[in-house]
Swiss-Prot record:
InterPro entries: AH/BAR_dom_sf, PX_dom, PX_dom_sf. Changing Y79A: Abolishes the intracellular punctate localization and decreases the cytoplasm to vacuole transport. This is Sorting nexin-4. It is found in: Cytoplasm, Cytosol; Preautophagosomal structure membrane; Endosome membrane. PROSITE patterns: PX. It comes from Saccharomyces cerevisiae (strain ATCC 204508 / S288c) (Baker's yeast). The gene is SNX4. One of its GO terms (cellular component) is phagophore assembly site.
């Protein structure tokens, strides 16, 4: 192997190491926009919202027979399509943190508010967050179903095939139910620290979320007050026009400043409501997705620990039989004796059965150990990727929050400097 080949392998190994998550081989730019109300199936009174998904990538396979690889791929999908994509990824990549989708928002469906601009625009942003997170994952972004979702013009036929292939994993559901009230006896300290940090982050994000909901509500109230003030100033201007033109001109200039303040506050509030708070809520859900993977890891660990306990009990029972103590209680032995059962033959038969069970359990325990250790390593790798994405998202979100506030204050300062100069 050449030095270059060795260096490539070494570099790839380092990318997969802890603390240095592997990056996807291609970049994606995905925008979800233009929500449109569509009619449902013939004979159905219900409708749905269709979203335009625009994709640009340097992965040339996405442009097969589609012309210029610099062009933008545009498809239209509905929420249920993205839900199917999410479920397929969850089913096919059990060791990955699958980015969450926004909630179904049952209240809006009941209230008939799911076609409002506020609801659909906020959902657009959240769906875009979901697809962007998938595109940043080195495995999910290279999946065939993700490519089909983003490029296929015949999605309906693919959708039916995908729905048929989506079978619930009954074993995992059963394991999750059986282990719901069990805990890992020997938890990795690293996972204990991860849990503590994620819980703290979740509490902090939840507090910020609640705080900015109050900010939005207060800003809406202030904007409404400024609008009313502007209307009153307009009426006052009309009253003095013709009698005191100088005062009317100054009222007009002052009203323009108030109007700019009202519009600026509305724009800032819209950003907070439609994007920043949505990002906070999506981050809360993303943290929960990470927790779900850790729970699944714990189930594998619990399976191993229970097998280990079962094997230990079987070995102990066999040793007791060999030493003459017996594996049954006194009354059971007496009943066997009265029934004419040969105690020594019965003891040897039990020992033979236990030896077979111990051999079988030893093999199962080794496999369970491999599964648990392998899942733990994959889980740690996924958490590294989660941390990388989460850090970048928070940094970008805070930067955007600062930029919008700076833009707001610069806009207001410019408007009121003009007012001050004119007055």
């Amino acid at each position: 192997m050449t030095d270059k080949g060795k260096n490539d392998l070494t570099s790839k190994a380092k990318d997969k190491a802890r603390g240095n998550p592997e990056k996807p081989p291609y970049w994606f730019e995905i925008i979800v926009s233009d929500p449109q109300k569509r009619t449902g199936d013939p004979g159905s009174s219900s409708g749905y919202v269709s979203y335009q998904i625009s994709t640009k990538t340097n992965n040339t396979s996405f442009y097969d027979n589609r012309g210029d690889p610099e062009s933008i791929i545009v498809v239209h999908r509905r929420y249920s399509d993205l839900l199917l994509l999410h479920d397929i990824l969850l089913n096919r990549f059990p060791t990955c943190i699958i980015p969450p989708l926004p909630d179904k928002k049952v209240f809006q469906y009941i209230a008939g508010d799911r076609f409002s601009q506020r609801f659909t625009q906020k959902r657009c942003h959240s769906l875009q967050n979901f697809l962007r997170r998938v595109s940043l994952h080195p495995d999910l972004s290279q999946s065939k179903v993700f490519k089909t979702f983003l490029v296929s013009k015949d999605w309906e036929s693919h959708r039916k095939v995908l729905q048929d292939s989506l079978q619930p994993n009954k074993d995992e559901v059963t394991d999750a139910f059986m282990n719901a009230f069990k805990t890992v006896h020997k938890q990795n300290e690293e996972f204990t620290e991860i849990r503590e940090k994620s819980d703290k982050l979740d509490r902090t994000v939840t507090k910020i979320d609640k705080l900015f909901h109050k900010v939005v509500k207060k800003n809406d109230s202030m904007s409404e007050d400024y609008t009313k003030l502007g209307s009153n100033l307009q009426e006052l201007q009309e009253l003095v026009t013709g009698e005191n033109e100088e005062l009317a001109a100054k009222l007009k200039i002052f009203n323009e400043g108030v109007t700019q303040l009202s519009y600026g506050l509305q724009d800032l509030t819209k950003y907070l409501d439609y994007e920043y708070i949505v990002d906070l809520k999506d981050l809360e859900h993303y943290i929960d997705s990470m927790r779900q993977l850790i729970k699944l890891k714990d189930q594998k660990q619990i399976d191993y620990e229970e097998l280990s306990d079962y094997l230990t009990r079987s070995i102990k029972e066999k040793n007791n039989l060999i030493s003459g103590y017996g594996g049954s209680n006194f009354f059971a032995n007496k009943l066997e004796e009265l029934a004419g059962i040969n105690q020594e033959a019965s003891r040897r038969e039990k020992i033979n059965k236990l030896e077979g069970k111990i051999t079988s359990l030893t093999g199962e325990l080794e496999n369970a150990k491999k599964v648990a250790d392998g899942f733990e390593q994959e889980c740690l790798k996924e958490i590294d990727h989660f941390e990388s994405v989460k850090t970048a998202e928070i940094k970008k979100s805070l930067g955007s929050l600062a930029d919008h506030h700076i833009e707001f204050y610069e806009r207001i300062l410019e408007a009121w400097e003009k007012v001050d100069d004119s007055l």
